UniProtKB/Swiss-Prot annotation:
Catalytic activity from the UniProt record: L-citrulline + L-aspartate + ATP = 2-(N(omega)-L-arginino)succinate + AMP + diphosphate + H(+)
CDD domains: ASS
UniProt entry tagged with the keyword Amino-acid biosynthesis: yes
Designated name of the protein: Argininosuccinate synthase
Chain's gene name: argG
Record-level GO BP terms: argininosuccinate metabolic process; L-arginine biosynthetic process; urea cycle
Organism per entry: Caulobacter vibrioides (strain NA1000 / CB15N) (Caulobacter crescentus)
Keyword tags: Amino-acid biosynthesis, Arginine biosynthesis, ATP-binding, Cytoplasm, Ligase, Nucleotide-binding
Subunit text: Homotetramer.
Length: 408
């Protein structure tokens, strides 16, 4: 039942099918004044058409907000996440998850500015995004009213949604096969495709699903070799050319795309309890992760590196589940950021037919001591004879256990 007390609602609006229907539904069911927010996250398509669609749906010009947030997205969300080498369930680089808190933050800021008493999103009632959006809303504005149409209206499937769209003359985009498109999410970090034939995890994804990369087998026969410069854990330059965060990630995406890097077909465990299959493309992020681990390998102490690796799965779960604004994520971030103080230097990377290989790394803060590790003779701080006592001390408890077991 619609809450008729809601007067103004800020809708996260893409201009696509779902949010176009939601816009009309909010106007008719709630009788509310709708304010739209459209974020340019680097999704690779023009977002200005969203303005025309909102106007055509009766939204006042002053209630239409379109903002280019690419630099903020990469600087304040993507890069902090990559300082942690964040990977969910060993594979997923969290391209969708990391965009939701920024959108939620912008909606709340607009709601405060415009005096809106509610916010709304287009996430379905089965997915993770509903959780991510709403935890973001409540984490920033605890008393805000949240309208989640997919949990309220009578549409139970995408087919019913298409019927509603046709009835109300809402434009339905088509892909080149003449069918309604896959469920797609895209931003500067990644693109994802779900639904239709992808719902069967036994069936290989058709090639036309991939939007961001060429097939690895079609990539050039010669490798591409680049350098990436880091300062305090963040990439700042490619091949010696300084770039802004969004520009740098865009360039890495282009390099990854041309070399077939960053494709991923996985089944993941959603926070809401079910498994889902998706096809992800994260070309620039895949390169960045490998390069960052490369520079950390010579600048981080073993203890700090191993502790970071232990903390990373928890950090990844917090991001995946929507707890970006939680104190525990901020605590972990503080520790991770502290670890990055000396993560500065240059990494050389080879891109070849879907593979990313670190082939060189250097840093003014390197902990790698060539004199110490060399097999050649020389004056070094390491005495081979010391290893005997080290081994015996570490073996002590194992020897005690073995003696007990021998006694029976």
């Amino acid at each position: 039942m619609a809450d008729k007390s809601v007067k103004k609602v800020v809708l996260a609006y893409s201009g696509g099918l779902d949010t176009s229907i939601i816009l009309k539904w909010l106007q008719t069911e709630y009788g509310a004044e709708v304010i739209t927010f459209t974020a340019d996250l680097g999704q690779g398509e023009e977002i200005e058409p969203a303005r025309a669609k909102a106007l055509a749906a009766g939204v006042k010009p002053e209630n239409i907000f379109i903002e280019d947030v690419r630099e903020e997205f990469v600087r304040d969300y993507v890069f902090p996440m990559f300082r942690a080498n964040t990977v969910y369930e060993g594979q997923y680089l969290l391209g969708t998850s990391i965009a939701r808190p920024l959108i939620a933050k912008k909606q709340i800021e607009i709601a405060r500015k415009m005096g809106a008493d509610a916010v709304s999103h287009g996430a379905t009632g089965k997915g993770n995004d509903q959780v991510r959006f709403e935890l973001g809303y409540y984490g920033l504005e605890p008393d805000i009213t949240v309208i989640a149409p997919w949990r309220e209206w009578d549409f139970k499937s995408r087919e019913a949604l298409l019927d509603f769209a046709e009835k109300h003359q809402i434009q339905i985009t088509k892909d080149k096969r003449g069918e309604a498109p896959f469920s797609v999410d895209a931003n500067l970090l990644h693109s994802s495709s779900e639904g239709k034939v992808l719902e069967d995890p036994a069936v290989e994804a058709p090639e036309f699903v991939h939007m961001r990369t060429i097939a690895p087998e079609d990539a050039p026969d010669a490798p591409t070799i680049i350098t990436i410069d880091f300062e305090k854990g963040d990439p700042v330059a490619i091949d010696g050319v300084a770039m802004s965060p969004a520009t740098l990630l865009t360039k890495l995406n282009e390099l990854g795309r041309d070399n077939g890097v960053g494709r991923l077909d996985l089944v993941e465990n959603r926070f809401v309890g079910m498994k889902s299959r998706g096809v992800y493309e994260t070309p620039g992020g895949t390169i960045l992760l490998a390069a960052h681990r490369g520079i950390e390998s010579i600048t981080l102490d073993r203890g700090a590196m191993h502790l970071k690796d232990e903390l990373m799965p928890k950090y990844a779960s917090l991001v995946y589940n929507g707890f970006w604004f939680s104190p525990e994520r901020e605590m972990l971030q503080a520790a991770i950021d502290y670890s990055q103080d000396k993560v500065t230097g240059r990494v050389r990377v080879k891109l070849y037919k879907g593979n990313v290989t670190v082939i060189g790394r250097e840093s003014p803060y390197s902990l790698y001591d060539q004199d110490l590790v060399t097999f050649e003779e020389g004056k070094v701080a390491y005495d081979h004879r010391d290893a005997g006592g080290f081994i015996k001390l570490n073996a002590l408890r194992l020897r005690v256990l073995a003696k007990r077991d021998k006694r029976g």
